[in-house]
């Protein structure tokens, strides 16, 4: 049964990649491309470029837009003609890569919480969701928030439950919080319930230690 689900999951994922890389640009992708461009210019000029404010982009920190644009510039250096003629392909390649990594994170997290069967099924159901599938290549906001949320939850869970690699898990937890905030400033609101549950778990886990500390 697992082999059948994995085969189907792989097929749907390949279909998602093909769809993402062949579909054209959506209406708001131009905004995110320009948002990445002006912030990239600001970085490479060490703050001398001051034309980075346009429309309502003050509500979009632009970390992912800048990263996506920077990766595109690497391809531009390698093959200028290809980049100029396939800018939609390049942007969607970055987006679908992050979307696929979010599915991997969902699989790993669900496997930790439940088992392999449920992890495969959860990943497949997520991929089959038309809102997720259809946005894998062209959405530079919501699926990146999902990516940040899933990997934050995964490493925060490891930090709370495992006694090994505590520093590594804490650093990666913090990294994905920062990454999510770099996409949307409201990201802490999304992860707040998870953090509260984690703190309660940690308190109960080390409750005896706290009591001994207070007794001293």
Model regions and ranges:
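Transmembrane signal-anchor helices characteristic of membrane glycosylation enzymes that use polyprenol
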Residues: 2-29, 180, 201
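Transmembrane-helix motifs of polytopic, lipid-linked glycan transferases
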Residues: 10, 93-113, 151, 155
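Transmembrane-embedded, aromatic-rich helix segments that form part
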Residues: 186-201
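Short helix- or helix-capping micro-motifs
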Residues: 122-127, 134, 154, 177, ...
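Juxtamembrane segments of multi-pass membrane glycosylation machinery
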Residues: 67-97, 116, 131
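Membrane-interface transmembrane helices that cradle and orient dolichyl/undecaprenyl
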Residues: 1, 152-170, 202-205
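Short acidic/glycine- and proline-prone juxtamembrane loop motifs at membrane-interface regions
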Residues: 26-27, 131, 137-145
């Amino acid at each position: 049964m697992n082999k059948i689900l994995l085969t189907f999951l792989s097929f749907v994922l390949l279909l998602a990649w093909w769809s993402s890389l062949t579909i054209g640009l959506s209406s708001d992708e131009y905004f995110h491309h320009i948002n990445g461009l002006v912030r990239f210019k600001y970085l490479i000029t060490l703050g001398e470029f001051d034309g980075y404010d346009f429309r309502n982009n003050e509500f979009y920190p632009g970390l992912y837009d800048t990263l996506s644009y920077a990766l595109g510039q690497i391809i531009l250096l390698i093959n200028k003609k290809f980049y100029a003629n396939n800018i939609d392909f390049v942007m969607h390649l970055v987006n679908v890569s992050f979307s696929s990594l979010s599915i991997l994170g969902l699989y790993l997290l669900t496997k930790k919480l439940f088992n392999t069967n449920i992890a495969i099924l959860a990943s497949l159901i997520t991929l089959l969701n038309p809102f997720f599938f259809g946005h894998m290549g062209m959405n530079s906001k919501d699926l990146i928030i999902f990516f940040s949320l899933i990997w934050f939850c995964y490493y925060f869970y490891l930090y709370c439950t495992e006694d090994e690699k505590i520093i590594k898990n804490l650093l990666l937890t913090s990294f994905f919080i920062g990454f999510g905030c770099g996409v949307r400033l409201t990201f802490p609101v999304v992860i707040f319930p998870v953090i509260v549950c984690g703190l309660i778990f940690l308190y109960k886990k080390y409750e005896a230690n706290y009591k001994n500390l207070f007794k001293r």
